[in-house]
Amino acid sequence: MRVVLLGPPGAGKGTQAQLISEKFGIPQISTGDLFRSNISEGTELGLQAKQYLDAGDLVPSEVTNKMVEARLDEPDAAAGFILDGFPRTVDQADALAAMEEARGVTIDAVLEFRVPVEELVQRLLGRGRADDTEDIIRNRLNVYRDETAPLLEYYQNVLQTIDAVGTVDEVFARTSQALGR
């Protein structure tokens, strides 16, 4: 099973990805984790990513795409994976489609986790991170909306929307149902 998870910061993608990974025995692939591991291992891609992250910039798609592709080539991803935080743009979705085509596979499901904006703001404020002021959070949500909205159309044939309000178990029940399991 090959699954893409979409949703704004605070929607619970990481939590749901972890549960899907445990239930179906497929790896959760998070771009944040890929950045951290490549940086800590001192890989060429990690060094490139670090320059952008240290400057407070987004890592360019070219670097992110190469990291994801290398991760998809690892043996544990052969039977399936969950992508959490990738793709974020149509360009990245096109790159993923090319990776799939090269491997003779397709994405089985794209799940969009929806949560009302005010709920997201409260969830993110509740994390207690120093850099999570309400203004910064609202800006992150706007950036997400603007850059990711075109993906909803891109994936319209495989997209399923999940109501991500409720307990972790309630949302996972909806997620499992959407995956047909």
Swiss-Prot record:
EC number(s) from the headed UniProt entry: 2.7.4.3
Residue positions binding ATP: G10, A11, G12, K13, G14, T15, R127, G166
Region of interest (NMP), residue spans: 30-59
GO biological process annotation, one example: AMP salvage
Enzyme class: transferase
Tagged with keyword Cytoplasm: yes
Catalytic activity: AMP + ATP = 2 ADP
Subcellular location: Cytoplasm
Residues spanning the signal sequence: none
Binding site for AMP: T31, R36, D57, L58, V59, G85, F86, P87, R88, Q92, R129, R140
Record PROSITE patterns: ADENYLATE_KINASE
Renumbered residue ranges of the record's region LID: 126-132
Presence of the UniProt keyword Transferase in the record: yes
MF annotations from Gene Ontology: adenylate kinase activity; ATP binding
Entry keywords, A to Z: ATP-binding, Cytoplasm, Kinase, Nucleotide biosynthesis, Nucleotide-binding, Transferase
Pathway: Purine metabolism; AMP biosynthesis via salvage pathway; AMP from ADP: step 1/1
Superkingdom of this protein's organism: Bacteria
One annotated Gene Ontology cellular component of this protein: cytoplasm
Stated family: Belongs to the adenylate kinase family.
Domain comment quoted from the record: Consists of three domains, a large central CORE domain and two small peripheral domains, NMPbind and LID, which undergo movements during catalysis. The LID domain closes over the site of phosphoryl transfer upon ATP binding. Assembling and dissambling the active center during each catalytic cycle provides an effective means to prevent ATP hydrolysis.
Function recorded in the entry: Catalyzes the reversible transfer of the terminal phosphate group between ATP and AMP. Plays an important role in cellular energy homeostasis and in adenine nucleotide metabolism.
Assembly behavior: Monomer.
NCBIfam families referenced in this protein's UniProt entry, alphabetically: PRK00279.1-3, PRK14527.1, PRK14528.1, PRK14531.1, PRK14532.1
Name of the featured protein: Adenylate kinase
Organism expressing this protein natively: Mycobacteroides abscessus (strain ATCC 19977 / DSM 44196 / CCUG 20993 / CIP 104536 / JCM 13569 / NCTC 13031 / TMC 1543 / L948) (Mycobacterium abscessus)
